[in-house]
Every structure is written in structure tokens, then in C-alpha cells.
């Protein structure tokens, strides 16, 4: 079979995307802590409502989190949670 007959596959760089999402969540969490907020409550508020006012501008957290779709953030959180549960 020649190279021309083979089906090429394209895979998104999922590891890079996951790492970026994870780094963003950690940065946002730290910014919320530094400002004296309850990070989990604020992130949940943002995820449920889509209102960026739940996230402070401190350390550019608001702009960072808005660059990632909320469904991608939820996907990463669920994957991380389930992976941790499997290891228990």
C-alpha cells in the first residue's frame, strides 16, 4: 500500500490543552485565595452562570478563565475527579 492510499489521522494536542486548562484553574484558584474568596464557591458560580464577575481581575485570572470554554473546564474537572476516584 502506498503512502497516498493510507488514511491520515489528526489528533488534537490534548495533553497541551489539558495542561493549559489545569494551569488556568490553579492560577484562578490561587488568585481567589489571595483575594480572600472561597475559591470553590466562586469557580462553581462562574461555571454555572457564565458570569465572569465571580472571578477577580487579580493576576489576570478573569481573562485567563474566559479563554477556555466552560464545558472544557467542566470536562477537565470531571476527568480529574474520576481519575482520582479510580486510584483510590
UniProtKB/Swiss-Prot annotation:
TM region positions: none
Disulfide pattern: none
InterPro entries: IreB (IPR009309)
Recorded family membership: Belongs to the UPF0297 family.
Descriptive protein name: UPF0297 protein EAT1b_2723
Native source species: Exiguobacterium sp. (strain ATCC BAA-1283 / AT1b)
